[in-house]
């Protein structure tokens, strides 16, 4: 009898865990027949695989995962292309994208924060392209090192001012503000609290609002 009771209790526990609050991500990826689509958790400690599906036909997909206790970051990945988004409640997100421009031409419904994250992603991509173009101009000897350094500083300062005003200080308690702090340019943090006192203020604003320790 005790053995049966224990087995029943274990089964109930497993059922309770599997049937708890969940979030759902669904949509379709066009032009991706036969491709693998991955759902991954994205954190400071790294990337963790959660689920995957082989896309067929029109590329419809649906993932369900336990709802996080606090805002967390996730991403969809196909090959080396990614779409970043956040989840902070029992949400249903719908993401549609073409395979070719997966990381930039997607649409997302059901999460205002995730749309802000898309805006930040597109801004970072544009910044990286401008820096790459500037570096190519230097390598072709079309500008001096002094002009390169000044132009690079202007690009970076303009970007940071835009993001600080419109994303970090405007709503420091959001996942988008947190996401902005950890964007990179050539694999270096754009906001660097270890080497820039003004950047420390950005981290402090978000940490205070979200009650976190970021630095």
Give the location of each predicted region.
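Amphipathic alpha-helical repeat scaffolds of TPR domains
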Residues: 172-188
């Amino acid at each position: 009898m005790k053995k049966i009771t224990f087995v029943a209790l274990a089964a109930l526990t497993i059922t309770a865990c599997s049937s708890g609050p969940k979030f759902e991500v669904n949509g379709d990826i066009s032009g991706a027949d036969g491709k693998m689509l991955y759902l991954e958790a994205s954190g400071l400690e790294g990337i963790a695989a959660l689920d995957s599906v082989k896309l067929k036909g029109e590329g419809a997909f649906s993932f369900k995962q336990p709802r996080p206790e606090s805002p967390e970051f996730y991403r969809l990945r196909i090959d080396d292309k990614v779409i970043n988004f956040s989840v902070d409640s029992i949400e249903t997100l719908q993401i549609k994208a073409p395979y070719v421009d997966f990381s930039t031409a997607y649409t997302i419904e059901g999460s205002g924060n995730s749309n802000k994250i898309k805006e930040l992603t597109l801004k970072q991509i544009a910044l990286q392209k401008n820096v790459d173009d500037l570096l190519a101009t230097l390598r072709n000897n079309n500008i001096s090192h002094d002009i390169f350094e000044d132009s690079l500083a202007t690009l970076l300062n303009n970007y940071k001012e835009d993001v600080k005003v419109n994303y970090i200080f405007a709503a420091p308690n959001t996942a988008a503000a947190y996401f902005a702090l950890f964007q990179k340019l050539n694999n270096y943090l754009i906001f660097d609290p270890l080497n820039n006192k003004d950047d420390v203020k950005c981290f402090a604003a978000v940490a205070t609002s979200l009650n976190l320790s970021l630095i």
